C-alpha cells in the first residue's frame, strides 16, 4: 500500500520539508508516503475563489489513481484518535488499495473532491496552517504505523 499526500501549494519553508522528510524516511518500504504538490493558481485581486477552488480540485482529481481510497481532510470530517488512525491504517492496508489524502488550498477542497472521497477526516476543529498539516500528517501516519508494529514510539 502506498499513501499519497496530495496537497495544494508548494515552496514550503525549510523546517516543513525537514520535518516532513524525517517521518517519510521512517515509514516502512511497504507503506511509503509520497507527497504530490498541486501548484496553487495565482490569486489576483479580483480572482473568484470558487473558480480557483474548482481549478485546484481538477488538478487534485487528475493526481488520483482510479483505485485509490480517497480521504479528504476536512474540518467537518470524522475525528480520529491516534489508535483509531492505526486501526484505519490497518483497514486501508488490508484492502490492498493505495490511499490518497487530500489537502485543499486556502479555500478548501472542491465539491468534486469531496464527492470523490471515500472518507472525510478532521485533524482538528482548529484551522491549521497548511505547512504544519504536512508535518503533522507525516508524524501521525508514522505513529499509527508504530502502534501496528508494537513499537514503543507511541505511549498511552
From Swiss-Prot:
It comes from the Bacteria. The keyword Cytoplasm applies. PANTHER family: METHYLTRANSFERASE, RIBOSOMAL RNA LARGE SUBUNIT METHYLTRANSFERASE H. Transmembrane segments: none annotated. Signal peptide: none annotated. The lineage of its organism: Bacteria, Pseudomonadati, Pseudomonadota, Gammaproteobacteria, Oceanospirillales. It is found in: Cytoplasm. Its EC number is 2.1.1.177. One of its GO terms (molecular function) is rRNA (pseudouridine-N3-)-methyltransferase activity. Belongs to the RNA methyltransferase RlmH family. HAMAP family: 23SrRNA_methyltr_H (MF_00658). GO terms for cellular component: cytoplasm. Homodimer. The gene is rlmH. It catalyses: pseudouridine(1915) in 23S rRNA + S-adenosyl-L-methionine = N(3)-methylpseudouridine(1915) in 23S rRNA + S-adenosyl-L-homocysteine + H(+). This is Ribosomal RNA large subunit methyltransferase H. Keywords: Cytoplasm, Methyltransferase, rRNA processing, S-adenosyl-L-methionine, Transferase. Pfam families: SPOUT_MTase.
